[in-house]
């Protein structure tokens, strides 16, 4: 596994931190478009979502992740119905609430630190 792949993957330790912090899907807790979901199974929180995605070298750390259900994770990743920007704003505010010194620039993998 490359250093980049390892750095962007959520470890078991980070996953546990996120699950303990969130206690469920952050968007379900805000009741964000849950009424539109036709399959209750999709609302089961079982995935870790990146704020800055792996495709943009987002780190696999608690400050860059939240617990989510399949419904909301898919909605966030695919930008369904033009909701991605709004969801990212909610996600950002949620993370800022938990980490006073939260900074997006610290969430991205840097091969060279200069």
Language model: regions and residue ranges:
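Short Lys/Arg-rich cationic patches that frequently serve as NLS/NoLS or arginine-rich RNA/DNA-binding motifs
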Residues: 1-9
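Catalytic histidine site
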Residues: 49-51
């Amino acid at each position: 596994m490359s250093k980049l792949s390892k750095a962007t993957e959520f470890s078991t330790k980070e996953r546990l931190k996120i699950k303990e912090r969130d206690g469920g899907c952050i968007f379900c807790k805000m009741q964000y478009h849950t009424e539109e979901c036709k399959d209750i199974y999709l609302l089961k929180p079982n995935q870790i979502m990146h704020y800055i995605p792996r495709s943009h070298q987002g780190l696999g750390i608690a400050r860059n992740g939240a617990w989510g259900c399949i419904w909301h994770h898919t909605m966030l990743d695919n930008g369904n119905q033009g909701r991605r920007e709004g969801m990212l704003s909610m996600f950002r505010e949620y993370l800022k609430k938990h980490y006073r010194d939260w900074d997006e620039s610290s969430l991205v993998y840097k091969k060279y630190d200069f």
